[in-house]
């Protein structure tokens, strides 16, 4: 990507300096923010892989199914609000972190892939614990091949431009997720509830976003600082999201912690 994207952008009409500037903002500014949720999914993966490997060795598929379902649920609880936050408050976040509002445009677009990226990370970890490294590698290569194809052929098209990369990135993330999910379902039965894994987190996220918006607008009347307003609104939003999860009984924190320890 570091070679192809700038070159293909020049075919779309960008100058060399413009192409490098756009690529730098995407890869050096927007992408690092996109990977922030991985700090949580990485902790899950590190915790789960050894446990799943042990349970697979003694053919305890029930525990593998329970651990995998819990890991996917926790991933969704992190990925959904993060994705919404990056999409809706992208300009404020980009201004807060980089003092460059235009980076927010790239962050907002690429953040549609957040949920799939996080799920891919978790699903790959589960499959690795089951000894399916070769399959996950093949799935990843197929996804990256599709991404490179879109990058190479869509970016030079003036109709798409740099959005060609985002399209390829999103489609590739969805493809890898689908392949990993299909692979996992062939080996274990996941116990996933639509209400707990999607509906309730979406409801809590809606409360979070609404609360953040109200607080940000209200604070902006008194405090003329994007930094302070964004930080306070984010803290308030996080609290509201956690309260939403507790009110809807989406997750039992004590049970979850104990399950991860076992």
What are these regions (language model features)?
Residues 135-161, 175-183, 204-216, 236-245:
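Alpha-helical transmembrane segments of multi-pass membrane transporters
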Residues 1-33, 54, 94-98, 249:
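Helix-terminus/linker motif at the lipid-water interface of multi-pass membrane proteins
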Residues 35-58:
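Helix-loop junctions and terminal segments of transmembrane helices
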Residues 123-131, 181-197:
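Alpha-helical transmembrane segments
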Residues 112-142, 153:
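Membrane-interface junctions at transmembrane-helix termini in multi-pass inner-membrane proteins
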Residues 67-87, 93-96, 163-188, 202:
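Short alpha-helical transmembrane segments in multi-pass integral membrane proteins
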Residues 20, 24, 86-115:
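Interfacial segments at transmembrane-helix termini and the short loops linking adjacent helices
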Residues 213-262:
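Membrane-proximal transmembrane or re-entrant/amphipathic helices at the cytosolic face
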């Amino acid at each position: 990507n570091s070679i192809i994207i700038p070159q293909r952008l020049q075919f779309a009409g960008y100058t060399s300096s413009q192409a490098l500037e756009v690529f730098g903002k995407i890869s050096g500014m927007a992408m690092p923010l996109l990977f922030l949720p991985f700090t949580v999914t990485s902790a899950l993966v590190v915790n789960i892989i050894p446990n799943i490997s042990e349970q697979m060795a003694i053919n305890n598929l029930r525990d593998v199914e329970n651990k995998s379902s819990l890991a996917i649920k926790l991933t969704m609880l992190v990925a959904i609000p993060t994705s919404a936050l990056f999409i809706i408050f992208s300009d404020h976040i980009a201004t807060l972190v980089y003092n460059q509002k235009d980076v927010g445009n790239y962050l907002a677009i690429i953040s549609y892939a957040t949920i799939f990226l996080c799920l891919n990370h978790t699903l790959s970890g589960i499959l690795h614990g089951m000894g399916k490294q070769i399959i996950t590698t093949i799935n990843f290569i197929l996804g990256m091949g599709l991404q490179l194809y879109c990058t190479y052929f869509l970016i030079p098209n003036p109709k798409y431009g740099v959005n060609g990369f985002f399209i390829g990135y999103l489609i590739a993330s969805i493809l890898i997720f689908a392949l990993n999910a299909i692979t996992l379902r062939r080996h274990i039965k996941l116990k996933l509830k639509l209400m707990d894994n999607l509906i309730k987190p979406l409801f809590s996220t809606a409360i979070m976003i609404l609360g953040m918006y109200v607080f940000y607008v209200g604070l902006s009347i008194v405090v003329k600082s994007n930094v302070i307003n964004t930080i306070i609104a984010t803290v308030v939003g996080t609290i509201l999201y956690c309260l939403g999860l507790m009110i809807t009984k989406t997750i039992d924190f004590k049970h979850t912690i104990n399950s991860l320890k076992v």
